[in-house]
Amino acid sequence: MAKVSVIVPVYNVEKYLKRCLDSLINQTLSDIDIICINDGSKDSSLQILEQYAQKDSRIVIYNQENSGLSVARNTGLEHASGEYIGFVDSDDWVDLDFYEKLYNSAKNNNADIAVADFIREHPNKKPKRLKLKEEKIYTTPEDKFMICKVHSEGCVWNKIYRTEFIHSINLKFVPKMYYEDRDFTIRSLYFSKKLVTTPNTYYRYFVNPKSIVNKRRNYIQDEHYILVRQQVLQFIKEHNIKVPDGLYKAEIYRYKLFGKTLFTIKESINSKYIFLFGKIQIFKMRLKNNG
């Protein structure tokens, strides 16, 4: 059994895939599985995967019809047999000591989840980073939610998860859903017994202008954006998780700002966008009424 199974969904990323795979096959922690899910790529991504798999037996390829990121990750979860599970998007990359440090941190502290730093790499902007100060254990939902910034980030790729823990709560990604990380993240953080932070190693998130979430938004993405953020706040309230008041105020501001933005662009004139704007206003009122 490998120490970490790394799940890599792949869809039309021929330009960036080698960089991603090179960062994985050269990890200082060599005892890893690299589970690549080819999600119906139409470019040369599959050929690149096959070339790497011929040279490195740790790379396993599963092919499926294009079904989206959530389904691809779920396929990876079905085949993951490592002690821990990690996720890497195929246009991103990781520091070479990334999984060694995460695994040692999780193992030494008997943690269900280990979380690392990340850098958001933008082609034309200064990198944005999450900077963890120290290795520290967190056990309460409130602390885990705040250190992982679930209200603004909620990502799965800068973490590893104990496989047994993920299977014990039957945790999967919601199919056909944009921003699918958020639901997985809040549930894993809430139900985990222990989380440990792992500083000084980075997941490199590449802001790819051609990726799904960075393309010109459509009304489905906008609706999912609203629904996912709503789920976070509802989950916090339903499970009586105490978070700073500023979190709710920040969320209300996001909805208000987002609604105004939708209303100023041409596409917002159609009924679907008006429906979304109405939903934002309704949810904002609910938040105010709930304190």
Regions found by a protein language model. Name each.
Residues 1-26:
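N-proximal low-complexity "stem/linker" segments adjacent to membrane-targeting elements
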Residues 18, 43-51, 93, 97:
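Acidic helix N-cap motif at the loop->helix transition within catalytic regions
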Residues 85:
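Short aromatic/hydrophobic "clamp" motif used to bind/position activated sugar donors
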Residues 155, 197, 206-280, 289-291:
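C-terminal subregions of glycosyltransferases and related glycan-biosynthesis enzymes
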